[in-house]
Amino acid sequence: MMGLAHLGGVGAKAPALSLAEAGRKLAEPVLDIRNLVVRAGSANLVDGVSLAVRPGETLCLVGESGCGKSLTCMSALGLLDDGLVSSGSVRLFGEETIGAPERALNRLRGRDVTMIFQNPMTALNPIRRVGQQIVEAILQHTDLRGRKAEARMEELLDQVGIPNVPRHKTYYPHQLSGGMCQRVMIAMALACKPKLLIADEPTTALDVTIQAQILRLIRDLQTELDLAVVFVTHDLGVVAEIADHVAVMYSGKVVETGSVDALFDHPSHPYTRALMNSRIGFGRVPGTPLQAIAGTVPSPSARPQGCAFSPRCALASASCTSTPGMVAGRGTMVACHHIGAGVSQ
């Protein structure tokens, strides 16, 4: 992970690996996705995505809306809507989930892997008290019963920073703020001490103060539980704060991936650089204007031939009509025909 101080400049030397970090690199992935394709009819919504996350690591999926980040996560849990078809390989703790029976998936969900969503108000049951909802998760996925389950619920609410637990556990979701509801969702997600937490833009609807508290909470819990975390976001400031590794997605594909330090120091894909140029910080010269990314993400059914970013890219050329493969950049892997070109942009 890197601190927000990194936003003011680039080029810092990466620190030496600690023993814990070196051990993670040798560990088997908790989540291992290879060549994932999600189709709706003839359109590939997710198109050949490969990524992995190991115990104690945070992988951030970054990109604009419609890039396939959330679908990739839903595929990992076998939660695709009817009519969507997936292929490739998604392994959770070494077990293949694509094509797995629902019973096997249910054994993993909630116990070994959990997910928190962008809007906790829609994820929580509006007619059940929040304490009851956490107890239900405990009863479903653990052997705790009665007062022991109740005590575990109270412990979790205290762990995520809910004040006056005896009072707030009796509240309904609408009686709590957005930040408090998100803390309840995190408590529910951690009820069974999972090994993998998937967080789908959990701080987008929160103000910056509450966002910082939630990010700090997730980091602290990750350290305590050795959690692997997949964090979906479009906010590069959040990425700088929590990520170990980053996968930049565009139009259903991963276009650049690598360690957070390598990607922020040496962004090689034009889309990655465009994302950074559209935000304050990230080595920007003071006083220079922000650069909006012209155009929009193409519809999966109307992608241009070759590189999907080429219609929005200042470096586009005739070679971009062929699909670029992943090649080595400056510390990252990049899907681009023009590696090294336009780095000063």
Regions found by a protein language model. Give the residues of each.
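Conserved ABC transporter NBD signature motif
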Residues: 85-96
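ABC ATPase NBD coupling module
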Residues: 97-114, 140, 146, 262-267, ...
